[in-house]
Amino acid sequence: MVPLRPLALGDIVTGSFSTLRLHWKRMAGVALLVQAVLLLAMGLVAAASVAAVFPHLEPVFDAPYGEAPTREHVMPLLVAAAVLFVALAVLGMLGMAVISAACLAVLKEAVSGGPTTFAAVRRVAFRRAPAMAGAMFLGYLIAGLPVLAVVAVWAPLAVATASEAAPGALLVPLVLGMLAAFPVAVWLSVRFGLAPAAVVMEDAGPVAALRRSTALVRGDWWRVFGITLVGALLAGAIGYAIQLPFNLIGSFVIVPAIALAEDGVSAAGAITVLVVAVLVTLAGGIAGQLFQIGFMQLVAGLLYTDQRIRREGLAEALLAGHAVPPAAPATAPEPPQQQDAPQDGR
């Protein structure tokens, strides 16, 4: 499936599609399991957040006409919203880490020629998920530092000069700063782009995986960037194509819901149709997102494999590991031993 030689762009794209085609059941099984757990956990977190601030909802969103909500009701809602955002972001990153680890675990066995079972993929995915999430978080954080630095410098200046400068003039420094920070952020993201593969392929920790990715990308940044860009474009286009039928079906299903509401039919029927439309659209979004995550991780994993083949002779090591040991040399049968004949008189 994956040739053990330096890989060209076509080899990487073809290998990614081949891995998806041959092992999609295992990857989809882990992904659906993760999505089910995530939806349940996110629902519980959201319900707990709403329950915690429920007494403050009516004073803020249904305040008497002409009266502004008081601080004692607004602040708990802001705190709950911030906590909910962080909790959902953490859960989302953990889910993406498990799915990414599952895809790379399948690729690892495909490259090395080992068996890939659902149980084995699930074990590796959940075992490496914390390290994967750590590597992803550190990579995103470091890559986003240039953009955060621009915003941190621009925001106080914008507040200090808001009353004096024209609104359009305040955006000029921000745009210029972003134009300078964006290339640096892209350079850093490509530099750390092979870290997830190192987490699964080498059982590396988050920091070690970032260092490993830096070492493998060094000197080949433009090649890694180009192949990653092609993979991202393919993943985005195919992911959108997967979502489109679901979105169209969801849009068509919403029309009867509107008609039911206008005809004065019971609200339960309209709500049921609306829920079906939302679920169909949500299913399409999840399917498209899972494809994009899986395909991009396979592209990154094959790039990692290619860099190791080119730099470290990984192909020779894998071939040596799968070589059949030579058979033992055949030995000639020993001649039968002759027994001494009994002598007379003895």
Question: What residues fall within each predicted segment?
Answer:
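Membrane-embedded alpha-helical bundles of multi-pass transporters/translocases
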Residues: 4, 15, 19, 29, ...
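Hydrophobic residues within alpha-helical transmembrane segments
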Residues: 33, 37, 87, 138-142, ...
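Alpha-helical transmembrane segments of multi-pass integral membrane proteins
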Residues: 130-184, 199, 203, 333-346
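Selective recognition of hydrophobic, aromatic-rich stretches within alpha-helical transmembrane segments
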Residues: 2-5, 77-113, 150, 166-209, ...
